[in-house]
Curated annotation (Swiss-Prot):
Keywords: Cytoplasm, GTP-binding, Ligase, Magnesium, Metal-binding, Nucleotide-binding, Purine biosynthesis. Substrate binds at A300, T301, T302, G303, R304, A305, R306. Its cofactor is Mg(2+). This is Adenylosuccinate synthetase.
Amino acid sequence: MGKNVVVLGTQWGDEGKGKIVDLLTEHATAVVRYQGGHNAGHTLVIDGEKTVLHLIPSGVLREGVQCLIGNGVVVAPDALLREIIKLEEKGIPVRERLRISPSCPLILSYHVALDQAREKARGEFKIGTTGRGIGPAYEDKVARRGLRIGDLFHRERFAAKLGELLDYHNFVLVNYYKEPAIDFQKTLDECMEYADMLKPLMLDVTAALHEMRRDGKDIMFEGAQGSLLDIDHGTYPYVTSSNTTAGGIATGSGFGPMYLDYILGITKAYTTRVGSGPFPTELFDDVGAFLAKRGHEFGATTGRARRCGWFDAVILRRAIEINSISGLCLTKLDVLDGLETINICIGYENEEGAVIDAPTDADSYLGLRPVYEEMPGWSESTLGAKTLEELPAAARAYIKRVEELVGAPIDIISTGPDRNETIVLRHPFG
């Protein structure tokens, strides 16, 4: 019987999911993306060579692994085709192994224009989106007016829907945001070109997944962003527009929760966040700068510098409950090498002095102060360690304390960017 494993982020994204998915796909028949879009940036380093993926599942670098994009993913055809071509230039036969649900909503030029116009209009109160049209595309989907990939293959139907959508969105762009209108004919011609290239990649992904399940194949589900960016469970409104938590798998791929065997939560050994929104343990001192520099904390998608802070056990406990996490993978442990002391946030203190748990929205974080537990750091290098015994005693104590505070086992420890720089204590497919 096959095993079905989920890999998802438990913080605000950028936890190192891509490397771990790539590592574990050695055992998988297929890797599935089920939410998000090309706002994701998954960085893989194999034998020193760096590859950044945005839409295509991280299993693409493993020979023979099928890569599936489920109906919950919003697809920008131009971005997808650029990514395919870039990988093909490296000799990877992407089109042989990539298949996409025709039910995926499309991201088109007017979504990007709306996204960027809104952020510009918000000024200092901007959400901090990637400006790639993700939110507006999900809005069209929920409003039941969006175009889907399957519409591309019916020109007359597509043109009629596109005309209605442009009438609606151009009115907002021109009259409210004072931005130029999107041209109908140019958009239609571009989309028809995309149709010819995308048609061979279409597949009923839900049916394919259940066929694999019945055949006893191992399947991996690859999450994008992080649990605290979930549209329902994140620090609203500073969130993404999809369900980044485990519940998104059922809706975004048609694969029910009863069939999931193991959910691996990825967490950094410290905390980072890109863009706006609450971040109780954020550091503005030399330690924050140290983490940013040592951790190369710049977004793979936007290039924006990430905000850095101490490990937050409070938000991780919340993510573990929401996702029913089976085990954790602790990444970037090596970034903490050289720190004399390390703090772990164990609670938040409000203005009355009471220690509380994680709030449910962004405004409720105002006035909260992190309560820290201090632990000794270590001077020895953990970079590239492959067994627990190779780690300094203080690093092992830090790992054990994190497990105790969050109530979940750490099954994998990442000690460097390469897929081989990993300690596996319990294998999700084992």
